[in-house]
Amino acid sequence: MASISSSVATVSRTAPAQANMVAPFTGLKSNAAFPTTKKANDFSTLPSNGGRVQCMKVWPPLGLKKYETLSYLPPLTETQLAKEVDYLLRKKWVPCLEFELEHGFVYRENARSPGYYDGRYWTMWKLPMFGCTDSAQVMKELAECKKEYPQAWIRIIGFDNVRQVQCIMFIASRPDGY
């Protein structure tokens, strides 16, 4: 029986310790050379809202659901909705209407993960209104959608087709009782 043996040779090199070292940077000066001013803790000059603190309220968690942009406001009138649509048209955004029959608020059905995505899919009302130049056109479509689905949440979206992002979204109509 033949045996094979192998040996591994190791090579160790020694380099001078000073060859790879870099001298420390000495160009910075200590902070002691700079003049400093010590200010007293004077809180009288800080901005204050004074007595108005008791008037401020947070969003109540019961009874009022938060929907989209502007959802903290009372329902918008037709004139106010038209002004919002005029704004998104001035920004050259494409208006689009969507509606939801069951859940017009944030809930988790299709995704359970936290974060920006809220798990909702809304149904698009017709196609995005490419080439729309007048808020009256959008308001006419909103009226048609309300007539077809009176118990639906309807929202108006402003879509930037250059950047391909949704820039604004707000509830235009809610079912009775919401």
Swiss-Prot record:
Write out the GO MF terms: ribulose-bisphosphate carboxylase activity
Q: Which SUPFAM superfamilies match?
A: RuBisCO, small subunit
- Organism superkingdom: Eukaryota
Q: Which InterPro entries match?
A: RuBisCO_ssu (IPR024681), RuBisCO_ssu_dom (IPR000894), RuBisCO_ssu_N (IPR024680), RuBisCO_ssu_sf (IPR036385)
Keyword line: Calvin cycle, Carbon dioxide fixation, Chloroplast, Photorespiration, Photosynthesis, Plastid, Transit peptide
> A single GO CC term, please?
chloroplast
Q: Output one GO BP term.
A: reductive pentose-phosphate cycle
Transit peptide residues? 1-54
The subunit field of the Swiss-Prot or TrEMBL record says: Heterohexadecamer of 8 large and 8 small subunits.
Q: What else is known?
A: The basic functional RuBisCO is composed of a large chain homodimer in a 'head-to-tail' conformation. In form I RuBisCO this homodimer is arranged in a barrel-like tetramer with the small subunits forming a tetrameric 'cap' on each end of the 'barrel'.
Name the family the entry cites.
Answer: Belongs to the RuBisCO small chain family.
Protein known as: Ribulose bisphosphate carboxylase small subunit, chloroplastic
- Native source organism of the sequence: Helianthus annuus
